[in-house]
C-alpha cells in the first residue's frame, strides 16, 4: 500500500483530467488542420477567379490558421508531457489572512474549468518549495508580498503516469533535485 493513499487518488484524478484535456487538444489540432487544408484547397481551386482583395483575405486566414495551429500543437505537446509526469512537488500554505492553499508543482501550468491544478515550477508561489523549510514563508505575487506558514512539503517521482515514490520533506530543496526533475 502506498504511504499516501490520498496522493494516489489525487494523481488518478489529475490523470483523468489531463486525458480529457489531451483529447480536446487533439480534436482542436485536427479541426485546425482540416480548416487549413480546406482554405488551401479553396484558394487553389478558385485561384483564377478570386479578386485581389479576396485573395488577400484568404492568405490572411491561412496565416492566422497556421499560427493558431502552432499554438494548439504546442499546448497539446505540453499536455502530453504533463501526462507522463504531471507534478513533482506539493506544498500546503496557510496565508496570514487565513486562506489555505494546496499547490502542486510541475513542469507546466495546468488549469481545468478555471481551477489551477498544477503550478509551473517558475511561478512565484512555487518558489516556496525550494526556498523554505516548513514554517514561516512567503512569496512575491503580482498583488504584493504574501506571507504565511508552510505546513507541508512533499516530493514525488511520477513516471509513465505511475507514482514511484512520495515523501514528506521539511527541508528546503536543493537544485540537483530541481534539475533532475525538469530535465
What are these regions (language model features)?
Residues 1-182:
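Extended, charged low-complexity regulatory segments
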Amino acid at each position: 500500500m502506498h504511504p499516501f493513499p490520498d496522493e494516489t487518488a489525487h494523481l488518478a484524478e489529475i490523470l483523468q483530467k489531463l486525458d480529457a484535456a489531451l483529447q480536446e487538444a487533439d480534436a482542436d489540432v485536427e479541426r485546425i488542420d482540416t480548416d487549413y487544408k480546406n482554405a488551401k484547397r479553396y484558394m487553389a481551386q478558385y485561384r483564377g477567379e478570386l479578386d485581389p482583395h479576396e485573395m488577400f483575405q484568404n492568405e490572411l486566414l491561412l496565416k492566422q490558421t497556421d499560427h493558431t495551429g502552432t499554438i494548439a500543437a504546442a499546448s497539446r505537446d505540453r499536455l502530453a508531457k504533463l501526462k507522463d509526469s504531471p507534478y513533482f512537488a506539493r506544498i500546503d500554505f496557510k496565508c496570514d489572512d487565513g486562506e489555505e492553499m494546496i499547490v502542486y508543482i510541475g513542469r507546466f501550468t495546468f488549469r481545468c474549468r478555471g481551477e489551477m491544478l498544477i503550478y509551473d515550477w517558475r511561478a512565484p508561489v512555487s518558489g516556496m518549495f525550494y526556498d523554505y523549510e516548513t514554517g514561516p514563508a512567503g512569496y512575491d505575487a503580482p498583488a504584493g508580498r504574501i506571507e504565511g506558514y508552510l505546513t507541508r512539503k512533499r516530493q514525488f517521482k511520477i513516471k509513465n503516469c505511475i507514482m514511484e515514490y512520495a515523501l514528506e520533506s521539511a527541508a528546503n530543496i536543493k537544485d540537483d533535485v530541481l534539475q533532475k526533475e525538469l530535465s
